Swiss-Prot record:
<dbReference type="GO" id="GO:0006412">
    <property type="term" value="P:translation"/>
</dbReference>
<comment type="similarity">
    <text>Belongs to the bacterial ribosomal protein bS21 family.</text>
</comment>
<dbReference type="InterPro" id="IPR038380">
    <property type="entry name" value="Ribosomal_bS21_sf"/>
</dbReference>
<dbReference type="GO" id="GO:0005840">
    <property type="term" value="C:ribosome"/>
</dbReference>
<protein>
    <recommendedName>
        <fullName>Small ribosomal subunit protein bS21</fullName>
    </recommendedName>
</protein>
<dbReference type="InterPro" id="IPR018278">
    <property type="entry name" value="Ribosomal_bS21_CS"/>
</dbReference>
<feature type="region of interest" description="Disordered">
    <location>
        <begin position="43"/>
        <end position="62"/>
    </location>
</feature>
<dbReference type="InterPro" id="IPR001911">
    <property type="entry name" value="Ribosomal_bS21"/>
</dbReference>
<keyword id="KW-0687">Ribonucleoprotein</keyword>
<dbReference type="GO" id="GO:0003735">
    <property type="term" value="F:structural constituent of ribosome"/>
</dbReference>
<keyword id="KW-0689">Ribosomal protein</keyword>
<dbReference type="GO" id="GO:1990904">
    <property type="term" value="C:ribonucleoprotein complex"/>
</dbReference>
<feature type="compositionally biased region" description="Basic and acidic residues">
    <location>
        <begin position="43"/>
        <end position="52"/>
    </location>
</feature>
<dbReference type="Pfam" id="PF01165">
    <property type="entry name" value="Ribosomal_S21"/>
</dbReference>
<feature type="compositionally biased region" description="Basic residues">
    <location>
        <begin position="53"/>
        <end position="62"/>
    </location>
</feature>
Length: 62
């Protein structure tokens, strides 16, 4: 879990900005969104193969 301590003489907006940055760097929200709903193993496999195909195409046309 991301933790941010508010520094002395730091505005709440600055602390919130630092907290959001740490959460995005840790990947907490992405992990939550990925696990929010159950995905059948067949769907996971299909999405994984599609992502691999996209990566392969991007590398080929670069």
């Amino acid at each position: 879990m991301a933790k941010t301590v508010v520094r002395k003489n730091e505005s709440l907006d600055d602390a919130l900005r630092r907290f959001k940055r740490t959460v995005s760097k840790s990947g907490t929200l992405q992990e939550y969104r990925k696990r929010e709903f159950y995905e059948k193993p067949s769907v996971k496999k299909k999405l994984k193969s599609e992502a691999a195909r996209k990566r392969k195409n991007r590398r080929r046309f670069k």
